[in-house]
Design a protein with these regions (language model features):
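Catalytic cores of the polymerase beta-like nucleotidyltransferase superfamily
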Residues: 1-201
Length: 201
């Protein structure tokens, strides 16, 4: 498939949800800013972007970046390894902890749960490896823009859970993705897209 790049204004969450303080957002934005100031393309990624567009206040923020683990540690010397082989570092900012993950592509999934290997890549390939289009969005909190490489925003607006790429391949990589599809559909009152639903049978 051809992944299109759409940029739009991010939607700030409604403040009446009360899940967490907005201090979490400020701390997460600070992590992105420090990475960007060091010259590394960096974004909010995945579920936090989805929730913000839906008007929900995220309980956590994941950050995706072009920085490799040693570069992350150079900026955050106390960063901890939580999956360095997969490009994931745990960074503390203020009193909050954030997963900071290097953009990557995944190798084969021999155990139907985790990739055997990863290759560090770019934002486009990182979005393409994710499970569902609604979780494949990035947000640049500095510019206040949503970066949509997988047409996820249209599926959010339509209320659709759709696998990225080939649904059978995507679900076979990690069998728990089928449960996640059902959970997202129930949580947001979304429909599971036909080809994705067929791949779950």
């Amino acid at each position: 498939p051809v992944w299109s790049w759409h940029v739009g204004t991010a939607v700030r969450p409604r403040e009446d949800r009360g899940l967490v303080s907005d201090d979490l957002y400020i701390a997460a934005k600070r992590v992105v800013s420090l990475l960007a100031d060091a010259g590394h393309e960096s974004y909010f990624a995945g579920g936090c972007v989805r929730d913000r567009i839906l008007g929900l206040l995220p309980e956590e923020y994941d950050i995706a970046t072009a920085a490799h683990p040693p570069q992350v540690r150079a900026i955050f010397p106390r960063a901890r390894r939580v999956g360095e082989a997969f490009g994931v570092m745990l960074v503390r900012q203020d009193e909050y902890m954030f997963d900071v993950a290097t953009f990557r592509t995944d190798g084969s999934y021999a155990d139907h749960r985790r990739p055997n290997s990863v290759t560090f890549s770019d934002a486009q390939h990182d979005a393409a490896r994710r499970d569902f289009t609604i979780n494949g969005l990035f947000e640049d909190p500095i510019k206040g823009e949503v970066i949509d490489l997988v047409n996820g925003r249209a599926d959010l607006e339509a209320g659709v859970v759709r696998a990225i790429g080939d649904p059978r391949k995507r679900l076979d990589e990690d069998h728990l993705r089928m449960l996640r599809a059902v959970r997202f559909a129930a949580r947001f009152n979304f429909a599971i897209e036909d080809e994705t639903a067929a791949a779950m049978q």
